[in-house]
Design a protein with these regions (language model features):
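A structural boundary/capping signal
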Residues: 1-145
Length: 145
């Protein structure tokens, strides 16, 4: 069995609620696909100059979490970070996982101190909505190849 670095991968057994992305049957499959799609253009602008392939999840959390919600359902939660931003992750039933926690290196995040996040709030920022749409389009292209 392949081991992953994202938090919660061992219990991330959620099933998709849609068949829009061929080959994605569990969150680990989505992580594998996104590993080919995440890029500087999908990274949050404030972190873009720090983005590199070796830290591919940097600045990708909210758009990835909402895209994951599109595919698997559930809710998106956020951990308040210094500076007032939220780091987003997914909760689907009893399954909790974070496809983008690798960006924090060895820092251990407290997932118990989190609040539900809503796409209407996050996507009120047009740049974030556009990054989400771009990520979704590129993922679909990758899955159709």
């Amino acid at each position: 069995m392949k081991k992953y670095k994202f938090w919660g991968w061992e219990q991330a057994d959620a099933k998709p609620i849609t068949d829009t992305c061929k080959g994605i049957h569990k969150p680990a499959d989505l992580y594998d696909a996104l590993s080919h799609v995440w890029c500087a253009d999908t990274c949050a602008p404030r972190l873009r100059d720090q983005w590199k392939p070796e830290n591919m999840t940097l600045g990708q959390c909210s758009i990835t979490a909402f895209l994951t919600q599109d595919l698997f359902g559930g809710k998106v939660y956020g951990i308040l970070r210094p500076g007032g931003n939220y780091h987003c992750f997914n909760v689907i039933g009893n399954c909790r996982f974070d496809l983008t926690n690798e960006q924090f290196g060895d820092e251990v995040l407290s997932y118990d101190q989190s609040t539900e996040q809503f796409r209407e709030v996050h996507f009120a920022k047009e740049e974030k909505r556009l990054r989400y749409e771009y990520l979704k389009t590129e993922l679909k292209k990758y899955c159709e190849r």
